[in-house]
């Protein structure tokens, strides 16, 4: 019996919607499109947790909202690339885009390429004919009347294309396609039977991005040609010039005929891509691969259960069910990155851009957005999967060994120099102080110290010297030699200095525990230098010039994106970045009363921003508190430090209910590799860690009647919110295992010991 394309889509939809009970299978609560609109920059592609390959739909090439390759408002698909980032504010990847076709294959751009979001072979699509669940993506390509589906393992993808009756079915492999039009300067392709091997090398955010590709078709290739723009350049070329595409022809197809295309990648060499494909996708088993991906996600999302007061998740009210969808979608996003970047044989491309032998049972990772993720993602993982954090630390240590310096933000084994601080120290200090040390502690500590002290020697020659001021900013030099970072000598001086202070404090915690008194004192003294940027006459942290005077003019609401004294923010947001010394910050303001008055002013100030080039990252505003970007994420919990927990509770409630939605534009800013989601997960459970490196959680306002955290040590920790409702946002009483808590804090040790945290909620503070 032949099935039409429409029937296939209906069948796939029914299978997904009726798969299981959401209380038993949390993948059914994942909305893959949350964050694909607005400026969330997520994507609905098919991945397994931390997958090295990220196959999915690509709908645009240019601009900020092309960062993941997909944007919900678009109505055309360029094809399906095999790599992408999730939620970032910088764009890269989009490697080896494929598109199944029928009829004549068009390859030229219409109009100017640099202004066109779509290629000549793009197909219209509708969201009504689009499906996505963890590990699966499917869509009807209107132009070709093809139902295209994708699923994946860690290193390999398999496409299933259901064709209509056609006289000329085929596919296009765009060897040059990449997000934001990187400059491709090396390219190879070779077809042998039904196997396609390709390679390209380009630069954009990554200064030297190299990737190998192997794909195999299930239907014999009848013919193929290679074109550059619209010019045929032959069949038997191996090395080709940029802007080349491979046009493959399968010949006729019957109605609902399925053609499969399986593919893999490697950062090392062609043999690596081949081994990855043979090891992880030996057969043409799309359904089996999808089921395995589903089971992996089902297990990953089962680490936390949300329940009604009486009953399970199915007994929640409609609002709470929608919030549960945001929660589990967030948990999904939190497990996408960092990504494995190592072949099945253990080899990986190091930060020196050389091949290294690694351990097959200890994957090497890339995509460390540490400026974002040190705040909530890694603290979350320390609770539900600390072994994953330890694996991250081992990879970061190896990056330091191979490249000479632990990166702030690495992408495909390239130093990007992106963002500020050295937040490897935060991740390390947090895990170290929580007792997790399954890594070489001596090496880990060595690289934390190395990251904090200004030194450009020993950095791999593979990293171009023009990147040195970004991966090893002079801010560290000025801090060491002058005690502050002059605003007229270093861009983003205040933000860089404040983050250095926090990172220095993190190193000091480890040094002190190890008995390294010299380094402990050195880094602790540096951690207190934040006081040099506080101007009591205005009550804000502000830029100080080399001659010791304050930079003028000054307005706390002013922003000049990445070209002022702050980083993606202004003085309103950055003046609170002293998470490691709240008591010291309170003293700067003149005591608790003045501190509270200033803190209240942050949330009551006008949200109007000043400047001609205001940072688009300043979003999700409550007053001048900007939840859409990371520097603000800890501030709400400062109220607990001044004995005003009710204020923390009502502000957490406000953010959870007004800045997160079950919709494509449901995030107030970039998702940032899981950070925005991790903030929601922790706070909706009822607590947050405002200072990673200090293993203490600040209690806020839980959203759900009952949450059970299934910890890897086998002990469950349950948070019960009695009398919980939309209006009952204040915590009247708190008990831990039956004993009253007199302060709104919980230690990591208490949490990991298991038990019950009972919060009695009230409508009045």
Question: Where is each model-derived feature located?
Answer:
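ATP-dependent phospho-/nucleotidyl transfer catalytic cores
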Residues: 503
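C-terminal motif of bacterial Sec signal peptides marking the signal peptidase cleavage site
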Residues: 18-19
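Bacterial N-terminal signal peptides that target proteins for export
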Residues: 1-9
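Accessory carbohydrate-recognition regions in carbohydrate-active enzymes
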Residues: 22-378, 382-426, 432-498, 506-517, ...
């Amino acid at each position: 019996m032949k099935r039409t394309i429409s029937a296939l889509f209906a069948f796939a939809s029914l299978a997904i919607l009726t798969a299981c009970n959401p209380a038993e299978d949390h993948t059914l609560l994942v909305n893959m499109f949350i964050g694909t609109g607005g400026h969330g920059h997520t994507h609905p592609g098919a991945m397994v947790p931390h997958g090295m390959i990220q196959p999915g739909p690509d709908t645009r090439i240019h601009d900020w909202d092309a960062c993941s390759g997909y944007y919900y408002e678009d109505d055309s698909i360029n094809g399906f690339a095999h790599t992408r980032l999730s939620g970032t504010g910088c764009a890269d990847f989009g490697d080896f885009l494929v598109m199944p076709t029928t009829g004549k294959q068009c390859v030229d751009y219409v109009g100017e390429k640099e202004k066109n979001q779509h290629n000549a072979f793009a197909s219209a699509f509708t969201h009504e004919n689009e499906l996505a669940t963890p590990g699966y993506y499917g869509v009807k390509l209107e132009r070709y009347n093809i139902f295209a589906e994708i699923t994946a393992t860690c290193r390999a993808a398999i496409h299933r294309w259901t064709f209509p009756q056609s006289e000329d079915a085929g596919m296009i492999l765009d060897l040059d396609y990449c997000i934001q039009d990187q400059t491709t300067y090396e390219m190879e392709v070779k077809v042998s039977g039904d196997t396609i091997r390709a390679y390209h090398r380009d630069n954009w955010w990554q200064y030297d991005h190299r990737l190998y590709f192997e794909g195999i078709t299930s239907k014999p290739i009848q013919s193929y040609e290679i074109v550059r723009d619209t010019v045929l350049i032959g069949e038997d070329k191996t090395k080709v010039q940029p802007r080349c595409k491979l046009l493959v022809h399968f010949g006729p197809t019957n109605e609902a005929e399925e053609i499969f295309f399986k593919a893999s990648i490697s950062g090392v060499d062609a043999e690596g891509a081949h081994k990855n494909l043979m090891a992880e996708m030996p057969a043409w088993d799309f359904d089996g691969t999808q089921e395995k991906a589903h089971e992996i996600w089902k297990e990953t999302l089962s680490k936390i259960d949300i329940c009604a007061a009486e009953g399970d998740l199915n007994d929640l009210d409609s609002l709470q069910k929608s919030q549960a969808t945001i929660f589990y979608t967030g948990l999904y996003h939190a497990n996408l990155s960092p990504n494995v970047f190592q072949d099945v044989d253990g080899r990986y491309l190091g930060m020196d851009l050389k091949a290294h032998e690694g351990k097959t049972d200890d994957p090497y990772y890339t995509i460390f957005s540490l400026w974002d993720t040190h705040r909530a993602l890694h603290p979350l993982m320390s609770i539900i999967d600390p072994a994953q954090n330890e694996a991250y630390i081992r990879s970061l240590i190896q990056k330091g060994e191979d490249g000479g310096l632990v990166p702030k933000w690495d992408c495909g084994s390239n130093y990007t120099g992106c963002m500020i601080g050295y937040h490897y120290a935060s991740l390390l200090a947090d895990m170290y102080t929580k007792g997790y040390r399954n890594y070489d502690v001596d090496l880990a500590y060595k690289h934390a110290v190395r990251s904090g002290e200004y030194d450009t020697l020993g950095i791999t020659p593979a990293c171009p010297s023009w990147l040195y001021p970004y991966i090893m900013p002079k801010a560290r030099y000025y801090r060491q030699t002058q005690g502050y970072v002059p605003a007229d000598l270093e861009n983003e001086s205040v933000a860089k200095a404040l983050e250095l202070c926090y990172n220095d404090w993190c190193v000091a915690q480890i040094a002190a525990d190890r008995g390294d008194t010299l380094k402990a004192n050195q880094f602790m003294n540096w951690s207190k230098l934040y006081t040099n940027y506080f101007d009591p006459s205005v009550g804000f942290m502000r830029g100080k010039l080399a001659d010791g005077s304050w930079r003028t003019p000054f307005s706390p609401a002013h922003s000049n994106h990445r070209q002022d004294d702050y980083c993606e923010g202004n003085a309103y947001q950055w003046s609170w970045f002293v998470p490691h010394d709240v008591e010291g910050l309170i003293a700067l303001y003149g005591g608790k009363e003045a501190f509270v008055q200033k803190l209240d002013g942050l949330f009551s100030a006008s949200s109007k921003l000043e400047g001609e080039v205001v940072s688009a990252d300043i979003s999700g505003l409550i007053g001048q508190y900007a939840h859409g970007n990371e520097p603000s994420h800890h501030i709400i919990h400062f109220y607990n430090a001044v004995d005003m927990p009710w204020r923390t509770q009502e502000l957490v409630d406000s953010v959870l209910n007004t800045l997160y939605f079950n919709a494509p534009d449901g995030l107030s800013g970039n998702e940032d590799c899981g950070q925005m989601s991790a903030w929601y997960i922790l706070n909706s459970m009822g607590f947050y860690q405002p200072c990673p490196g200090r293993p203490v959680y600040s209690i806020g306002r839980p959203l759900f009647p009952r949450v059970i955290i299934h910890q890897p040590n086998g002990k469950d920790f349950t948070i019960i919110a009695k009398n919980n409702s939309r209006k009952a946002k204040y915590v009247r009483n708190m008990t831990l295992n039956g004993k009253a808590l007199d302060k709104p804090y919980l230690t990591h040790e208490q949490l990991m010991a298991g038990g019950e945290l009972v919060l009695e909620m009230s409508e009045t503070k």
